[in-house]
Amino acid sequence: MLAILDYKAGNQTSVQRALNKLGIPNQITSDKEVLSKATGIIFPGVGAAGQAMDELTSGGLDELLKDLVQQKKPLLGICVGCQILLDYSEENDTQALSVIPGECRLFNPSWEDYEGVPIRVPHMGWNQIELKQDCILFKDIDPEAHFYFVHSYYPAPEEKYIIGETIYGRPFCSLHGREGLWAVQFHPEKSGRPGLKLLSNFYEYCKEVSDA
């Protein structure tokens, strides 16, 4: 069973609808025992980084997440959940979870697209991922596939944790982490067939690890 972390700052219901469509058993929960026993955890998030961290820390879920990552529990962070796995976010001057070294930065509106036009902030719409490392999440996904983004801040982890990049004015990290701990800036639950496949790949990985 996949646990969808409920901390009042996520897009839990849209993630759950996607998992239900795939027939993947899941539960939206903030119960620490349920989270600890889950096959894997999806850590969604929308809104502001500061509010998200406040909600996590108020219930002690920040320390639980760190402990579960230390125990190699598979975890997938989405959007704000992706960003606050890093050390720091410029949004609200937020000290984050420090699970992955790096920080989250505001897009520079002076960046220009391929036509020389300044980019719009937030980055909103469909874009591609260029993998910099092999990633099991992208198994059997078309390299030309597009995923849905909506964000004003982007993750900037240490280089060795960058798994995929997307171009918006210039390249930025849109997928980071390591095996068993992944963070995506885009919304797989809103990305049609490629996004559903990514979620399915995450679940299959979780089952393999659980059965090992």
Curated annotation (Swiss-Prot):
It comes from the Bacteria. SUPFAM superfamilies: Class I glutamine amidotransferase-like. Keywords: Amino-acid biosynthesis, Cytoplasm, Glutamine amidotransferase, Histidine biosynthesis, Hydrolase, Lyase. The keyword Magnesium does not apply. It catalyses: 5-[(5-phospho-1-deoxy-D-ribulos-1-ylimino)methylamino]-1-(5-phospho-beta-D-ribosyl)imidazole-4-carboxamide + L-glutamine = D-erythro-1-(imidazol-4-yl)glycerol 3-phosphate + 5-amino-1-(5-phospho-beta-D-ribosyl)imidazole-4-carboxamide + L-glutamate + H(+); L-glutamine + H2O = L-glutamate + NH4(+). One of its GO terms (cellular component) is cytoplasm. Its EC number is 4.3.2.10, 3.5.1.2. Residues 1-212 form the Glutamine amidotransferase type-1 domain. PROSITE patterns: GATASE_TYPE_1. InterPro entries: Class_I_gatase-like, GATASE, Imidazole-glycPsynth_HisH. The active site is at C79 (nucleophile), H187, E189. One of its GO terms (molecular function) is lyase activity. Gene3D superfamilies: 3.40.50.880. One of its GO terms (biological process) is L-histidine biosynthetic process. Pathway: Amino-acid biosynthesis; L-histidine biosynthesis; L-histidine from 5-phospho-alpha-D-ribose 1-diphosphate: step 5/9. IGPS catalyzes the conversion of PRFAR and glutamine to IGP, AICAR and glutamate. The HisH subunit catalyzes the hydrolysis of glutamine to glutamate and ammonia as part of the synthesis of IGP and AICAR. The resulting ammonia molecule is channeled to the active site of HisF. Heterodimer of HisH and HisF. This is Imidazole glycerol phosphate synthase subunit HisH. It comes from Maridesulfovibrio salexigens (strain ATCC 14822 / DSM 2638 / NCIMB 8403 / VKM B-1763) (Desulfovibrio salexigens). The lineage of its organism: Bacteria, Pseudomonadati, Thermodesulfobacteriota, Desulfovibrionia, Desulfovibrionales.
